[in-house]
Amino acid sequence: MNFQEFRNKWFDLGCISPDQIYSWRPDFDKNNISNWSKKGLIIKLRNGFYLFPEHKTRSGFAFYVANRIYRPSYISLHSALAFYGMIPESVVQITSVTSRKTATFSNAIGEFSYKTIKPDLMFGYDVKPIDEGHSFLLAKPEKALIDLLYLYPFYNTKFEIEELRLDMDFIQNDLNKNLLKEYSKQIDCKALEKRVKLII
């Protein structure tokens, strides 16, 4: 198989794994992946996941990659807060939560960070389309905030909350406070409920 045939088959998918390739061509030579990666024809994201470089700068595609290379997961915490304009800082890492163990990956796309939460706390996210065939899972604003307060318990005073530099216009006018309270109660953590009250 030459690279052009490979590209024609998998380019639209964007992020691919050898398992997918072997299901298509059981006799596929795994050395092709290594050779094409060395030539820059594909980008290694982590063991078992590759990306065509043309997708590297596509808007929103880094979030799609984040979902793909470590499942199950969804974009949350600082990346989600920045996406909604709730915090002013640009976020260097792409932050997600997962029911798997905490992990980080660094590649040509960026740095990906995953924080562990319990499987029954994997809720409160939406499917965000990028284009036809590509989408990513993103925490709702309320769940991104809940995930942050749950995973970073040092945000337990007014001063620490202020250090987040949350957009108060968003908090007052756009944040669904009833949903925030509902998520907090669903997690059933008294310390978390106290931290939520510092915001609302």
How would you label these PLM feature ranges?
Residues 20, 53-200:
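Nucleic-acid-binding surface
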Residues 1-72:
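Short beta-edge/loop segments at beta->alpha junctions of small alpha/beta modules
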